[in-house]
């Protein structure tokens, strides 16, 4: 085998190992046919924060668009009016998701909710103790399991699953109010998602302030519900100011909800 052939073989074998490593951390779309020039960004994404962009829908066709802070700032006022901002897209630790620009509200403008379902076993929703809780990113699936199991139920005076229901009911914009209906499938974040929000809280708040020009959108010193179950009595909550993950009684305590969606 010539030196040139040996080099080509080594490069191919190295690429195969890189592909396996990237697939192992969640990048199923990476294959041997992927460009190697893409790998450095994926490695950065796997190990920390890759980027944050404003997630928008174009009014003319409801298509999804994403802009960096610089790209959004470069648009003329007329061009900005062609889009409705849906939320902030975050790509970090192999996870791509969009965080809602504001908290969920209940009737009467309350921002606090029960989790619901005290004492009830939710089929398919596994219990997450302290270790596994940090790597749980099944928020969308878990939210649906919660809704299906608790629909029409009443537990200790709490009907259904208020926190999960608030998350899926969230709308970034509506046909009546904005001329376009938000069809995003919002859900209650998992504990892993909330830890990302805590870890990059300052950067997230900076971007929320830049894109929405309002401090009312910011992540603040509050406890937020997650969709991550601890047991039949408690679920995980996260204080995004301190990073404290605390199990709280599902029907005794009322906490805030910040919906997210898959990118």
Spans of model-derived segments:
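Short, compositionally biased
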Residues: 1-182, 251-263
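An exposed tryptophan-centered "aromatic clamp" motif
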Residues: 153-187, 191-251, 262
